[in-house]
């Protein structure tokens, strides 16, 4: 068990996954709150909304019509953050002197970023979230993620054979497949979901985004560097493999687990009820999951989202995302990657009080009040049937 003294004193915790520190202040949980309160998401949505750009059969903003899909539907984002076609930019690489132009080139660096962005609906039903779906209903979402990831792998990728095996097991999407980027080999695929208006979601229809980029983004890049460093310094051991063993032995931050996945409030969590879903065996990417593990992963996602909603009996907002091996990588980068999923929810004390990353957190380092151990205990107590099913 964690030293009990840490439950009562301010202290810092280290995040070995990205090399950062955060401040924990458990004594502040009793402070009064007179600040901003969020409007809880209590409105009942229709199963079909004729004005929704994502519902089956509807027209999207740029004029294309969605098919009358039954489960998932993926398409190229009409407002992509990165594009394949754009004017070429060649950054200067020879700034080695002390002249004004050299200094400016050193300090004002830029690099082109290209790619392709997709939108993926989780369900045809406008009023359904992952928390409302069964594990078997979530599996097609995971299968679509897998197909899109596999279609973007480089020709020399260490996981090409695994991708071929995986695709042979997964049925094709009856509503069609998205075409991968063709102009160049992309470096990384970031799958993420912003759920709820509090997290900036612009459409309540259940969906996620998939951005494929020519560069390795900052967060997965830092994690990959840390995992590679750990692997080199500890005779081939894996950082998250060892972390899973530590958390399973201690138990106090474990929220839920099955044979394939561990759900924890990590030691280094920044957000009040932050959760990390980690593969128990060395899975480097979606394409290495077996059919049984895809179901186990779906169960883990269902458990997290359902417990979130049960915690404050509201449609719990969060941002979530998957980190896995890059689309184009070396043997070492593939070997040191470990499949995991982050959940970052903002709610702190109730359905109306959220955490803000401001002030000290922006100027110094992240800070939290409730400890990860306390958060895990509360989430463990929120299992069972989704609260709103008893209200129907």
UniProtKB/Swiss-Prot annotation:
PROSITE patterns: GAL_P_UDP_TRANSF_I
Entry annotation: catalytic residues: 207 (tele-ump-histidine intermediate)
Residues binding Fe cation: 223, 323, 340, 342
Gene Ontology biological process terms in this record: galactose catabolic process via UDP-galactose, Leloir pathway
A GO MF label: zinc ion binding
Disulfide bridges in this chain: none
Claim: Nucleotidyltransferase is one of the keywords in the record: yes
Matches recorded under InterPro entries: GalP_UDPtransf1 (IPR001937), GalP_UDPtransf1_His-AS (IPR019779), GalP_Utransf_C (IPR005850), GalP_Utransf_N (IPR005849), HIT-like_sf (IPR036265)
Gene this protein is translated from: gal-7
Binding-site positions, UDP-alpha-D-glucose: 61, 77-78, 194, 209, 355-358, 360-361
Cofactor note: Binds 1 zinc ion per subunit. Zinc binding seems to play a structural role.
Protein name: Galactose-1-phosphate uridylyltransferase
Keywords: Carbohydrate metabolism, Galactose metabolism, Iron, Metal-binding, Nucleotidyltransferase, Transferase, Zinc
Catalytic reactions on record: alpha-D-galactose 1-phosphate + UDP-alpha-D-glucose = alpha-D-glucose 1-phosphate + UDP-alpha-D-galactose
Superkingdom of source: Eukaryota
UniProt similarity note: Belongs to the galactose-1-phosphate uridylyltransferase type 1 family.
One GO CC term on file: cytoplasm
Residues annotated for Zn(2+) binding in this entry: 52, 55, 126, 205
The UniProt record lists the keyword Glycosyltransferase: no
């Amino acid at each position: 068990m964690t030293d009990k003294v840490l439950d009562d004193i301010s202290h810092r915790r280290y995040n070995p996954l990205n090399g950062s520190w955060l401040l924990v202040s458990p004594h502040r949980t009793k402070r009064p709150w007179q600040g901003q309160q969020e409007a809880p998401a209590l409105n009942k949505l229709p199963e079909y909304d004729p004005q929704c750009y994502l519902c089956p059969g509807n027209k999207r903003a740029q004029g294309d019509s969605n098919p009358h899909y039954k489960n998932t539907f993926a398409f190229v984002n009409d407002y992509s953050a990165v594009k394949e076609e754009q004017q070429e930019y060649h950054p200067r690489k020879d700034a080695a002197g002390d002249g004004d132009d050299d200094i400016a080139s050193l300090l004002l660096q830029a690099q082109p970023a290209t790619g392709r962005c997709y939108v993926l609906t989780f369900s045809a039903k406008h009023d359904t979230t992952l928390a409302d779906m069964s594990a078997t209903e979530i599996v097609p979402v995971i299968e679509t993620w897998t197909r899109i990831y596999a279609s973007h792998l480089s020709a020399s990728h260490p996981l090409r054979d695994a991708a071929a095996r995986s695709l042979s097991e997964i049925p094709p999407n009856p509503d069609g497949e998205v075409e991968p980027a063709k102009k160049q080999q992309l470096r990384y695929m970031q799958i993420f979901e912003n759920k709820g208006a509090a997290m900036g979601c612009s459409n309540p229809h259940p969906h996620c985004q998939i951005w494929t980029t020519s560069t390795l983004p900052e967060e997965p890049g830092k994690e990959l560097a840390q995992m590679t460093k750990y692997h080199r310094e500890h005779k081939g051991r894996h950082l998250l493999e060892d972390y899973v063993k530590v958390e399973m032995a201690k138990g106090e931050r474990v929220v839920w687990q099955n044979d394939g996945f561990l759900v924890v409030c990590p030691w280094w969590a920044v957000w009040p009820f932050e959760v990390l879903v980690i593969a128990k065996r060395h899975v480097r990417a979606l394409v290495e999951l077996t059919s049984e593990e895809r179901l186990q992963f779906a169960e883990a996602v269902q458990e997290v989202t359902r417990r979130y909603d049960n915690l404050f009996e509201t449609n719990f907002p969060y941002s979530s995302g998957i980190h896995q091996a890059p689309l184009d990588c070396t043997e070492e980068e593939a070997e040191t990657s470990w499949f995991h999923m982050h959940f970052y929810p903002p709610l702190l004390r109730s359905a109306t009080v959220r955490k803000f990353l401001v002030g000290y957190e922006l100027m110094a380092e992240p800070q939290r009040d409730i400890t990860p151990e306390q958060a895990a205990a509360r989430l463990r107590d929120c299992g069972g049937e989704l609260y709103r099913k008893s209200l129907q």
